[in-house]
């Protein structure tokens, strides 16, 4: 559950961050700039606060449309996106500023569409930044507890919630197993990032 959920949420988060960063740098309008600033506020808000806000919004949607979205994986993924969009945004924004600025201006002057500029110029130049952004979001999601604990579907367990449940029951030795799995799952990308940074230096 943890790996699959983290991978899907990371991919969607990175895609949204890429579109936001590109739009801000390509179109340079106040509305797009404001949307970017608004989108990355989630990282400064506690996960429990975001979860309660989403639960309130879900209640309104449930009553208005007569559908049930509370306690679904879609809700949980949306919460992860709101919470960790800033992580991916920062990585991609710095990568685009470093690698793509002059190429975007050149493509605009040559009449290339925004779609062409994004996928034929920016994405190839941002491969490393995209990968790093995905890894950072993946690591954060793997260890996120408040959001997952409040918004998870019934009988849906992740490594973080399993660790919490066992620790809450005072089963400390048993809780060390999922906790160790979290460490093992995130240590590979962390080591890779450290080596990447050292190589860059």
For the regions a language model picked out, list residue spans one by one.
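Transmembrane alpha-helix signature in integral membrane proteins
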Residues: 1-24
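Alpha-helical transmembrane segments of multi-pass membrane proteins
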Residues: 1-9, 39-42, 115, 119-132, ...
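Membrane-embedded alpha-helical segments of multi-pass transporters/permeases
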Residues: 14, 18, 48, 52, ...
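C-terminal transmembrane helix and the adjacent membrane-cytosol boundary/short C-terminal tail
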Residues: 23-28, 93-108, 112-120, 135-136, ...
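Membrane-interfacial helix termini and adjacent extracytoplasmic/periplasmic loops
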Residues: 27, 31-35, 48-83, 115, ...
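Hydrophobic transmembrane alpha-helices
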Residues: 38-45, 74-85, 135-142, 152-154, ...
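Transmembrane alpha-helices
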Residues: 78, 82, 89-92, 100, ...
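Interhelical loop and adjacent transmembrane-helix boundary motif
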Residues: 142, 148-191, 198
